[in-house]
Amino acid sequence: MNTSNFARLKELFRRAAAGQELTIGFLGGSITQGSLSTQPGNAYAFRVYQWFVDTFPQSKFHYVNGGIGGTSSHYGVARAVTDVLMYQPDFVAVDFSVNDLEVPFRQETYEGVVRKLLTWPSHPAVVLLNNIYCLLYTSPSPRD
């Protein structure tokens, strides 16, 4: 996978500046869903969508939120088509950072999500969001 190709984002911004109709999608868990937001408009997904609306007023945007609390990329790869991709998105942000564990199986399912998005016929710009944290252990080995 190429982790540093901005061509799809540049094309998305070009199309938005040209006034095209675009679909902005999100796939993830509870953070994407908007859990614990004080109101729906404060959820990160809606705020990103609203940024597109405010920045490119000449375009019409559709908002697709495929966030379901408590789900990981294992479930996300299975529902990517029905929850987001069937709407032919031009942009998809992905966040499973809280629910995915750092184990090979989850890394494979996360990669499956990314590959599914990148190979979808609408060629969406894909932005991956991750939460980086470190568990502190008092013993020399995390397994002790």
Set out the residue ranges of the language-model regions.
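Short beta->alpha junction loops
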Residues: 64-72
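N-terminal secretory targeting modules
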Residues: 1-27, 32-40, 45, 49-59, ...
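A short helix->loop->beta-strand "cap" motif at the edges of active sites that frequently abuts
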Residues: 120-126
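Conserved small/polar residues in nucleotide/adenosyl-binding loops
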Residues: 137-144
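Oxyanion-hole/transition-state-stabilizing segment in secreted/luminal serine hydrolases
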Residues: 13, 17, 25-27, 33, ...
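Generic structural signal for well-ordered alpha-helices
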Residues: 110-115
